[in-house]
Amino acid sequence: MKKGARGNITKLLQEKLVSLGYNTNGVDGIFGTGTEKAVISFQKNNGLVVDGIVGQNTWRKLLNI
């Protein structure tokens, strides 16, 4: 999932990031700049590849925290 994605799964991502203390600039189901910045911060803080894209490894880490 990357910038431009929309829908319930994006909203779930935003809710999880917010619950972990990351600012997504709202939980609206739209993967915009705020969500991308939050994903990048999460990736940096968790030793993941920093690309702003929520792939398998990023999802796995998010769901296991």
Where is each model-derived feature located?
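Intrinsically disordered, low-complexity Ser/Thr-rich linker and spacer segments
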Residues: 1, 5, 60-65
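Acidic, Ser/Thr/Pro/Gly-enriched interdomain connector segments
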Residues: 1-29
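Structured segments of extracytoplasmic/periplasmic soluble domains
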Residues: 16-20, 42-46, 65
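Alpha-helical hydrophobic/aromatic positions enriched in membrane-embedded helices and signal peptides
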Residues: 24, 47-48
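Conserved hydrophobic/aromatic packing and binding residues within compact polymer-binding modules
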Residues: 39
